[in-house]
Amino acid sequence: MNLMTMITGVVLAGGKARRMGGVDKGLLELNGKPLWQYVADALMTQLSHVVVNANRHQEIYQVSGLKVIEDSLADYPGPLAGMLSVMQQEAGEWFLFCPCDTPYIPHDLAARLTHQRKDAPVVWVHDGERDHPTIALVNRAIEPLLLEYLQAGERRVMAFMRLAGGHAVDFSDRKEAFINVNTPEELARWQEKR
């Protein structure tokens, strides 16, 4: 079976957005379109099944027709909790996670991660300068380890990805595709550029 048909795309929109003053980043607009919708659209061109992990404004995300999954852990302790929640509530074998604030993810993201994963249960993007561990292709097999990690109070995404036996995939030729929007000032700069 083709691995691409077994991957569930996931827009991670469950964060607290502290650097954005608590505003739901996924709903901020870039050129008249919510940030999360850019990510969902890019995933839908690559995968047949896409869901959203969101803890606030779920009714707005649901208008898209996509399934919305809330974190199963209290206090929404970060992106790993979103990943775990999706794995607990979706039947898929593989999951391609992307944060809602990366509107320019490439349309070959799933294919490149899939083809370069070797036998790793998790792979993530490296843009030539830095790792992007929340843009990751993850196998369900790591779910028990992830639950244990979170129950131990750990939250560091990169540390977990390495612990799970993963490796980075080089996307240095597409570095600009992984710039994320963390502050209102960054969003304003992107508005001017695009």
UniProtKB/Swiss-Prot annotation:
Q: Which CDD domains match?
A: MobA (cd02503)
Q: What Pfam families does the database record attribute to this sequence?
A: NTP_transf_3
- Any idea of its EC number? 2.7.7.77
**Annotated compartments:** Cytoplasm
Q: What class of enzyme is it?
A: transferase
Catalysed conversion reaction: Mo-molybdopterin + GTP + H(+) = Mo-molybdopterin guanine dinucleotide + diphosphate
Query: Binding positions for Mg(2+)?
Result: 101
**SUPFAM superfamilies on file:** Nucleotide-diphospho-sugar transferases (SSF53448)
For binding GTP, which residues are annotated in this chain's numbering?
12-14, 25, 53, 71, 101
GO term, biological process aspect, one: bis(molybdopterin guanine dinucleotide)molybdenum biosynthetic process
Its biological purpose: Transfers a GMP moiety from GTP to Mo-molybdopterin (Mo-MPT) cofactor (Moco or molybdenum cofactor) to form Mo-molybdopterin guanine dinucleotide (Mo-MGD) cofactor.
What's the source species for this entry?
A: Escherichia coli O6:H1 (strain CFT073 / ATCC 700928 / UPEC)
- Can you list the GO cellular component terms from the UniProt entry? cytoplasm
Q: How does it assemble?
A: Monomer.
Q: Which family does it belong to?
A: Belongs to the MobA family.
Q: NCBIfam families from the entry?
A: molyb_mobA (TIGR02665)
Gene name linked to the record: mobA
Protein's recorded name: Molybdenum cofactor guanylyltransferase
Entry remark concerning the domains of this protein: The N-terminal domain determines nucleotide recognition and specific binding, while the C-terminal domain determines the specific binding to the target protein.
